[in-house]
C-alpha cells in the first residue's frame, strides 16, 4: 500500500510557482510519482518495466475568487517511459491543501509538503472541492485558459441546462475503481445532475467517446445516451488536440443489462429441473427493445451530410479489408499458440473444442480469403465499438447506452475506424452468449441440473434471445437500407465479426479464467458450423478442403 508519509517535499517557492523549483519537480518525478501511480487503479503500466516518470506539462487551473487558500491547481501531464522504449501519458490533477480535510481519502494524498514556509499536503485535486468547482465553472462558461503550451478550452454542450450555468453546485468523487475518474455535480433543489469523466490515460487525439456522444447529442434525435454537457480539451501549440475530460447528464438507473439478463436467466433456470421451458414475455419485450435501440443508434450514426466527414459512410475498401484481415490473422496466430501452450490445463470439453478449432484452421483461412475477395456493397460507419450488456443501463422500462470509448486494447486511431454496425451487433450477441454460458458452466443455480439437459435448454434460450434481438434490430434498420445490401451480406458480415470477437475473447479466458475457455470456443464452433452451411450451399464451391461436417464435427462429440 502506498504511504504518503514516506516522502516530504520542501520548496522555498509558493505552491503557485511549483514548476519553477526544479529540485521539487525532480523529487516528484523520482520519489513521489513512481510509487503513487503504481498504487492507482487507473495506471495501466504496473506490469511493465518502468524506466522513468517525467512531469511533461503542468496546466494551471485558477480557483474561484472566493477560494480560501492555494489559489490554483495543476493539471499535470505525466510521461511514463518504459524499458522497451515506449511511452504513455497520464493526467494527474494536483492541489495543495494546508490543513487536513476529512473528505480527502488516504489514496488521494501523494506526499506531505512545505511551500514558502506553509506546511500541507499535495493531493490528487479531484478530492479538493475547490478544483471540482473550478472545473464546473470553466466548463459551463466555456472558458479558454492560456497555458505555456497551448491552451485549455472548455466546451459546453446541449446537455447542460441554461438555468444551471450560474446555479449553486455541490460535488463529490464517485467511489468507483476504473481506468478513469468520475466526478458528480449536484444542482440545488434538483439533486445530482451531471457526471464528469476525467480521462487518466491520454492520447494525442480527440477521444472517440467525446466525438460520438457530442455528435449523437448535437446532431441527432437519439436520446438514449447520457446527453453531452461539455468537455475539456488541451489544444497544443503543435500537435493534435488532447481530450482531458467529458461531462454528461446523470441518468437514474436500476442496474446494467448484464445484471438484468442474469436475473432473467435465474427465473428461467428455476423451472428447468421441473422439465419446464418457459421464457417470460417481458424478457422478449426487453430484448426486442434493445434490438430497436441498437438499430436507432446506428441510424443516428449513419450520416450522409458532406460537412461531417468524420461520420460519413464509407465502402468496404481493399485497405479496410486488409486491415481487418491482418489484425485477425495476427490474433488468430497468437490464440493458436496460447491454446497449444495451455492445452493440458484445459478440461476435457474445452480440449475437444480447442482441437476442432485448431483442425478447422484451413477452413477459417478460406473464409478469410472469401472476406478479402467477395464483392461487398454494404457500408461502414462510426460505431459504439465495445458494445455489450454491461454498456446498457436499465432505466425503468427503457435503456441508456454508455461508454463509447471503444475497445480498451485498441489505439485511438483504431477506435475511430469505421466498421459495419454489425460489429456492434456481434458484440451484443456474444454478450448474451456469455450470460447464458456463465450460468451453464459456473453458477450455483444450475448445480443440480443434469448437464446434457442443461446444455440443450441453455442453447435454446440463447438462440431464441439472439434471433429476437437480431430480428428487432434489422426491422428497425429497414430494408432496403444503404447500410446493408441484402440478407446474404448481413449473414456473411455478422459471421466475420462474431468470429473475430470470439477469437479475441479467447485470449483473456486462457490467461485469466481457464475454466471459461469453453465459452468463446463454443462461440467459435457456432460460427464454424455456419461457415460450413455456406460452403455446402455454394454450388460454385471448388475448394479441395473436405466438408467439415463429413468428419470433424461428427467425430468429436461436444
Which residue ranges define each predicted feature?
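ATP/Mg2+ or Mg2+-diphosphate-binding catalytic cores
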Residues: 456-484, 492-557
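Catalytic-loop Lys-Pro-X-Asn motif of eukaryotic-like protein kinases
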Residues: 389
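Short amphipathic beta-strand and strand-loop transition segments with alternating hydrophobic
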Residues: 49-68, 77-79, 173, 231-232
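Conserved ATP-binding subdomain of kinase catalytic cores across diverse folds
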Residues: 73-337, 395-402, 407-459, 463-467
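An alpha-helical support segment within catalytic cores of ATP-dependent transferases
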Residues: 158-169, 334-381
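Conserved catalytic-loop position in the HRD/HxD motif
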Residues: 386
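Short Lys/Arg-enriched alpha/beta "domain-start" segment
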Residues: 9-52
Amino acid at each position: 500500500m502506498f504511504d504518503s508519509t514516506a516522502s516530504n517535499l520542501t520548496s522555498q517557492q509558493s505552491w503557485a510557482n511549483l514548476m519553477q523549483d526544479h529540485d521539487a519537480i525532480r523529487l516528484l518525478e523520482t520519489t513521489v510519482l513512481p510509487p503513487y501511480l503504481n498504487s492507482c487503479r487507473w495506471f495501466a503500466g504496473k506490469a511493465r518495466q518502468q524506466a522513468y516518470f517525467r512531469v511533461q506539462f503542468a496546466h494551471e487551473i485558477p480557483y474561484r475568487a472566493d477560494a480560501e487558500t492555494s489559489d490554483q491547481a495543476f493539471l499535470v501531464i505525466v510521461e511514463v517511459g518504459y524499458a522497451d522504449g515506449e511511452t504513455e501519458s497520464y493526467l494527474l490533477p494536483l492541489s495543495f491543501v494546508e490543513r487536513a480535510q476529512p473528505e480527502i481519502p488516504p489514496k488521494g494524498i501523494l506526499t506531505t509538503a512545505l511551500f514558502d514556509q506553509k506546511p500541507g499536503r499535495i493531493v490528487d485535486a479531484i478530492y479538493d472541492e475547490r478544483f471540482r468547482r473550478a472545473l464546473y465553472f470553466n466548463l459551463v462558461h466555456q472558458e479558454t485558459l492560456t497555458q505555456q503550451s497551448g491552451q485549455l478550452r472548455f466546451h459546453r454542450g446541449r446537455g447542460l441546462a441554461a438555468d444551471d450555468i450560474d446555479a449553486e453546485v455541490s460535488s463529490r468523487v464517485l467511489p468507483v475503481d476504473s481506468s478513469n475518474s468520475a466526478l458528480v455535480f449536484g444542482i440545488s433543489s434538483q439533486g445530482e445532475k451531471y457526471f464528469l469523466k476525467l480521462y487518466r490515460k491520454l492520447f494525442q487525439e480527440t477521444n472517440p467517446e467525446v466525438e460520438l456522444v457530442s455528435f449523437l447529442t448535437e446532431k441527432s434525435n437519439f436520446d438514449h445516451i447520457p446527453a453531452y454537457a461539455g468537455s475539456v480539451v488541451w489544444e497544443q501549440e503543435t500537435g493534435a488536440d488532447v481530450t482531458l475530460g467529458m461531462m454528461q447528464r446523470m441518468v437514474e438507473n436500476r442496474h446494467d443489462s448484464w445484471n438484468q439478463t442474469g436475473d432473467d436467466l435465474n427465473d428461467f433456470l428455476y423451472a428447468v429441473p421441473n422439465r419446464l421451458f418457459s421464457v417470460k414475455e417481458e424478457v422478449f419485450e426487453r430484448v426486442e427493445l434493445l434490438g430497436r435501440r441498437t438499430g436507432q443508434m446506428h441510424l443516428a450514426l449513419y450520416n450522409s451530410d458532406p460537412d461531417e466527414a468524420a461520420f460519413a459512410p464509407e465502402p468496404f475498401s481493399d485497405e479496410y479489408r486488409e486491415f481487418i484481415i491482418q489484425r485477425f490473422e495476427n490474433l488468430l496466430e497468437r490464440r493458436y499458440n496460447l491454446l497449444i501452450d495451455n492445452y493440458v490445463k484445459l478440461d476435457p470439453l474445452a480440449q475437444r473444442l480447442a482441437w476442432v478449432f485448431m483442425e478447422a484452421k484451413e477452413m477459417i483461412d478460406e473464409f478469410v480469403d472469401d472476406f478479402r475477395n467477395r464483392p461487398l456493397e454494404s457500408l461502414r460507419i462510426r460505431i459504439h465499438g465495445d458494445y455489450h450488456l454491461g454498456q446498457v443501463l436499465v432505466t425503468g422500462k427503457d435503456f441508456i447506452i454508455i461508454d463509447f470509448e471503444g475497445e480498451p486494447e485498441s489505439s485511438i486511431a483504431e477506435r475511430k475506424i469505421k466498421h459495419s454496425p454489425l460489429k456492434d451487433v456481434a458484440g451484443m450477441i456474444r454478450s448474451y452468449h456469455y450470460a447464458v454460458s456463465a450460468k451453464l458452466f459456473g453458477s450455483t443455480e444450475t448445480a443440480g441440473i443434469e448437464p446434457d439437459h442443461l446444455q440443450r435448454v441453455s442453447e435454446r434460450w440463447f438462440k431464441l434471445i439472439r434471433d429476437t434481438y437480431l430480428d428487432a434490430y434489422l426491422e428497425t434498420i429497414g430494408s432496403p437500407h444503404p447500410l446493408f445490401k441484402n440478407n446474404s451480406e448481413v449473414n456473411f458480415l455478422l459471421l466475420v465479426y462474431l468470429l473475430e470477437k470470439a477469437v479475441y475473447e479467447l485470449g483473456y479466458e486462457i490467461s485469466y479464467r481457464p475454466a471459461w475457455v469453453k465459452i468463446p470456443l463454443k462461440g467459435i464452433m457456432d460460427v464454424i458450423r455456419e461457415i460450413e452451411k455456406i460452403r455446402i450451399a455454394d454450388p460454385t464451391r471448388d475448394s479441395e478442403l473436405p466438408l467439415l461436417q463429413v468428419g470433424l464435427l461428427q467425430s468429436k462429440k461436444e
